[in-house]
Amino acid sequence: QHLADYDEVEDDRAKLHLDAR
């Protein structure tokens, strides 16, 4: 479960990075 949460956070960060572009 913890790994899943971490994956979700990473996904959000990636999304933010793409949006920031």
Swiss-Prot record:
Gene Ontology cellular-component annotations: extracellular region
Subcellular location, principal: secreted
Localization terms from the record: Secreted
Domain of life: Eukaryota
Modified residues (Sulfotyrosine): 6
UniProt key word Transcription: no
Pyrrolidone carboxylic acid: modified positions: 1
Post-translational modifications: Conversion of fibrinogen to fibrin is triggered by thrombin, which cleaves fibrinopeptides A and B from alpha and beta chains, and thus exposes the N-terminal polymerization sites responsible for the formation of the soft clot.
Keywords, comma-separated and alphabetical: Adaptive immunity, Blood coagulation, Coiled coil, Disulfide bond, Hemostasis, Immunity, Innate immunity, Pyrrolidone carboxylic acid, Secreted, Sulfation
GO biological process, one term: innate immune response
UniProt note: domains: A long coiled coil structure formed by 3 polypeptide chains connects the central nodule to the C-terminal domains (distal nodules). The long C-terminal ends of the alpha chains fold back, contributing a fourth strand to the coiled coil structure.
Summary of the function given for this chain in its UniProt record: Cleaved by the protease thrombin to yield monomers which, together with fibrinogen alpha (FGA) and fibrinogen gamma (FGG), polymerize to form an insoluble fibrin matrix. Fibrin has a major function in hemostasis as one of the primary components of blood clots. In addition, functions during the early stages of wound repair to stabilize the lesion and guide cell migration during re-epithelialization. Was originally thought to be essential for platelet aggregation, based on in vitro studies using anticoagulated blood.
Subunit (UniProt): Heterohexamer; disulfide linked. Contains 2 sets of 3 non-identical chains (alpha, beta and gamma). The 2 heterotrimers are in head to head conformation with the N-termini in a small central domain.
Protein name: Fibrinogen beta chain
Gene responsible for this protein: FGB
